[in-house]
């Protein structure tokens, strides 16, 4: 049976009934929903009109009429309804109309489904769904988006001022911008977001201008942090998620970047004041706010560095002033107080770096640079390297000024080693430390072997094995020396004929590890010569390949002084003992006679005689009785001497070792510079002057800050010794001579 042909007008009239019914439903009029039979009739009508033989295939006409149906509805109903409303009411109407429009598109595209499947697919035309959305875009959106944008921004600003707004409505309206873009974000970004960001900038620019005048730095930061939190909430509630970084950037720029220096430099509440008053919460907030801004932390780190430097400089100045106003004894106590205070300062600001500033490298660098400034200053002629070595000595020696528990000692040593990192003359510290370590070990002044080894381990980790190898050798030497002494005592036990009749303890040391000491060919008293010979005999039974050099200046003697009232045990140096023993054979000796008998230098003899005749314990009487020793003086044994103690120690005036240490270090530095230059040139063969100097500085600065002039001088010296030569063509180039 042949199907009856439907002409265009008749078919479209029927479709209009369905479209009208749909519009009535959308307008909320009392209209029953479509039943399946009505739906099928509408679908079939379209199907039939599209599958009739030409010229009755109305596919193209129906495709056009589909679009016209939307256009008619929008022009007659939707636009008039929207044009009469404003602000929030207009936004509500827009959302309602958009929701209805999507329903209309869904229903109509189902009625016209056959068009989508065949006609549109074959002709590559826009699909029905897209045509429906395009109608709304071209007729409604293009006319209204500017008003909509203004209404939305007005509501956002209301909310910023603390008013309650309908966030769900804003979300729904802003979703239209995204949906109209059909998968692209241009409409949202160009028609709404760019204006909203501009408004945000203006809004916060106004706020910042008044807050920066009225508020303290902490209050301003609190407000800023709150604003940023609120803006992020806005994104979560109604803006598109892609707006967050842009929005936050605008707020940060206006509140934190534009007024950064004014905020941080506020006189009574800015960054300096917060550091001065230990406002850790505010400083943490400052870090949180500024670390998200490109280079935002640099000024904060800079102020931090200046603040720490000023505090450190003040401590150094305080120690300097005290040292100037006081006697030497209390000055050295002040210097020790200084190191303790510097450690406390470091502890305090390290907590700031790790907690307030979240371990950020900029603040580690600022702290390091600040400490390097004041940790390399001298106090009353003492370098910081020496002060630090003395501080360690006070902790590690018996009866030192620092009375601490084992744990506290370990903790303090750890901190001292950290401070050493800031000191440029590490080699000078090493030399002072070695000198003091030698005294602790040789005169049995070290309080605890474990602590001695522990600090060496810490120093080794910090500065490398080369730094501590000699010191470790010294500690080991002493253990070996004790074993050696036990063997010597066993030897005497089995060779009674060899016993010198004097208790003798000898400490044998390895030359390379210990500081250099002057050794003199002093004419020893016969009692002592016997001791030396006996020990030599013992030592040769152990080894024939080692030479013993005696350092008498480090020895100690216990001698019995028989005075008129009572006998007193005198603890003296080997040299002092040698002087006193001369008086066993004669009561009176002139300076010249003593000098001839002992074969000492004038300088040493004056020190010895002064300690025995002019100081606290006058074992010898001097003629004339003056405070200084001269070459015309005569000395006699003071038999009337007495003291309430049965045993007394007669000290020698201390020799200022500082000059010698500095000289030794300077000498070592010359060798170190030579070695560095040769090492570099050996690997590079040819190198420019400037580059050689800078590589040299880089290699050496782990141990000391090499002086450029000294490097140049060493280069010249190496040229004269045929290690290097200047290039004939270019005197700024050096060649290595193998």
Swiss-Prot record:
InterPro entries: Cullin (IPR045093), Cullin_CS (IPR016157), Cullin_homology (IPR016158), Cullin_homology_sf (IPR036317), Cullin_N (IPR001373), Cullin_neddylation_domain (IPR019559), Cullin_repeat-like_dom_sf (IPR016159), WH-like_DNA-bd_sf (IPR036388). It is found in: Nucleus; Cytoplasm; Cytoplasm, Cytoskeleton, Spindle; Cytoplasm, Cytoskeleton, Phragmoplast. The keyword Transmembrane does not apply. Pathway: Protein modification; protein ubiquitination. Its main location: nucleus. GO terms for biological process: auxin-activated signaling pathway; embryo development ending in seed dormancy; ethylene-activated signaling pathway; jasmonic acid mediated signaling pathway; leaf development; phloem or xylem histogenesis; protein ubiquitination; regulation of circadian rhythm. GO terms for cellular component: condensed nuclear chromosome; cytoplasm; nucleus; phragmoplast; SCF ubiquitin ligase complex; spindle. It comes from the Eukaryota. Residues 668-730 form the Cullin neddylation domain. Pfam families: Cullin (PF00888), Cullin_Nedd8 (PF10557). Neddylated (rubylated). Deneddylation occurs upon interaction with the COP9 signalosome (CSN) complex. One of its GO terms (molecular function) is ubiquitin protein ligase binding. The keyword Lyase does not apply. There is a cross-link at residue 682 (Glycyl lysine isopeptide (Lys-Gly) (interchain with G-Cter in NEDD8)). Belongs to the cullin family. Part of E3 ubiquitin ligase SCF complexes such as SCF(TIR1) and SCF(COI1). SCF(TIR1) is composed of CUL1, SKP1 (SKP1A or SKP1B), RBX1 (RBX1A or RBX1B) and TIR1, while SCF(COI1) is composed of CUL1, SKP1, RBX1 and COI1. A SNF1-related protein kinase (KIN10 and KIN11) can also be part of these SCF complexes. SCF(TIR1) is able to interact with the COP9 signalosome (CSN) complex. Interacts directly with some F-box proteins such as DOR, SKIP14, FBW2/SKIP18, SKIP19/FBL20 and SKIP28/MEE11. Interacts with CAND1. This is Cullin-1. It comes from Arabidopsis thaliana (Mouse-ear cress).
